[in-house]
């Protein structure tokens, strides 16, 4: 990959094909609506989906057919506002919600805009992402930051919003026990949000010792490394070692791994709640007998919806959730591809790419 142009107006990090990226100077995007704002992007976190597109060129039905700007976990500074904008001004620091729904379909009108079939989501084909100098969003999808949240932390609001949505789907209430499978960024944030929602017992489960050690220091009250035994045996150990009685109240899977799904179902008490937040293979086997006989509440969770981003910002602003510990590396925009290699190699927790000229 060549060096970025020296005089670029809107330098962008573009995926052309599998493991084929380039820097490209693109036109500065124009405001499409009177309520739009132009954001000078300052920091962008790298998500597993970004790496998946870089490695495979597709995720399920979403296939990169034309060159696409990567990135969707971003923060920035307002550079220009539309004529009808009333809540933001030039110079405001914001967290950027990267998916714009149609606002007219039934899911949108029901407040479930994350299920909008016409969602224009950053770095999801055919829509360009946020790894550019400038990006346009509606004003109500930019969240003004209080003074105690910096722009690096603001780039973590996107995965935090994913975790907020998962925990809300689980209806976590004070006093309930929660077991979280997967101690990657979203799983770790689920632990933190569950604690903020009042759970006194949050157990993180993962196969990587380093991730578990981080989870224990960060937000989990206990950790568990599965053995190479059956899902039922691992589930029994989790229950017994953590005094969960008849089982956990809530299980969240943030891994997408089939063994985690099986173990999670067996960990739950009768009448417990299971939420699938991690995505793995399209189809897996599922312990349907246990789910039926225990009358489990089984739910999915996808991205984030109404109020999730705002709550994410409020949780950090109030000190109930901290995200700065998750930021384990920052690279310059010119070294953007390095961040993808680091994430693929499993280095650190959350790597950020600084914006152009930052």
From Swiss-Prot:
Molecular functions per Gene Ontology: D-xylulose reductase activity; L-iditol 2-dehydrogenase (NAD+) activity; zinc ion binding
Pathway it acts in? Carbohydrate degradation; L-arabinose degradation via L-arabinitol; D-xylulose 5-phosphate from L-arabinose (fungal route): step 4/5
What EC numbers are recorded for this enzyme?
A: 1.1.1.9
- The residues that the entry says bind Zn(2+) are 47, 72-73
Offer one Pfam family short name for this entry: ADH_zinc_N
Q: Which UniProt keywords apply?
A: Carbohydrate metabolism, Metal-binding, NAD, Oxidoreductase, Xylose metabolism, Zinc
Annotated residues for binding of NAD(+): 182-187
Designated name of the protein: D-xylulose reductase A
Identify the gene encoding this protein.
Answer: xdhA
């Amino acid at each position: 990959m060549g060096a970025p142009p020296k005089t670029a107006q809107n330098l962008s990090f573009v995926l052309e094909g599998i493991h084929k990226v380039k820097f490209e100077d693109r036109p500065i995007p124009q405001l499409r609506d009177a309520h739009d704002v132009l954001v000078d992007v300052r920091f962008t976190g790298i998500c597993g989906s970004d790496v998946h597109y870089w490695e495979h060129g597709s995720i399920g039905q979403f296939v990169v057919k034309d060159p696409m700007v990567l990135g969707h976990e971003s923060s920035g500074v307002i550079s220009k506002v539309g004529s009808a904008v009333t809540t933001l001004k030039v110079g405001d620091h914001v967290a950027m919600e990267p998916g714009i729904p149609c606002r007219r379909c039934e899911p949108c009108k029901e407040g479930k805009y994350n299920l909008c079939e016409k969602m224009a989501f950053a770095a999801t084909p055919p829509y360009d992402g946020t790894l550019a100098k400038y990006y346009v969003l509606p004003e109500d999808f930019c969240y003004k930051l209080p003074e105690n949240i910096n722009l690096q932390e603001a780039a973590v609001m996107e995965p935090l919003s994913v975790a907020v949505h998962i925990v809300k789907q689980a209806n976590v209430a004070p006093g309930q026990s929660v077991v979280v499978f997967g101690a990657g960024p979203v799983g770790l944030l689920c632990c933190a949000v569950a604690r903020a929602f009042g759970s006194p017992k949050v157990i993180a489960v993962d196969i990587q010792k380093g991730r578990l050690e981080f989870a224990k220091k960060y937000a989990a009250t206990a950790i568990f490394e599965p053995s190479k035994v059956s899902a039922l045996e691992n589930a029994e150990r989790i229950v017994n070692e953590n005094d969960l009685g008849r089982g956990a109240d809530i299980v969240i899977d943030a891994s997408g791994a089939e063994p985690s799904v099986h173990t999670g179902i067996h960990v739950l008490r009768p009448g417990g709640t299971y939420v699938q937040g991690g995505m793995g293979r399209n189809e897996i086997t599922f312990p349907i007998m246990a789910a039926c006989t225990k009358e489990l509440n089984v739910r999915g969770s996808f991205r984030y919806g109404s109020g999730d981003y705002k709550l994410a910002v409020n949780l950090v602003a109030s000190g109930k959730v901290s995200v700065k510990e998750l930021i384990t590396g920052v690279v310059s925009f010119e070294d953007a591809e390095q961040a993808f290699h680091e994430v693929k190699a499993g280095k650190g927790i959350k790597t950020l790419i600084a914006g152009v000229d930052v």
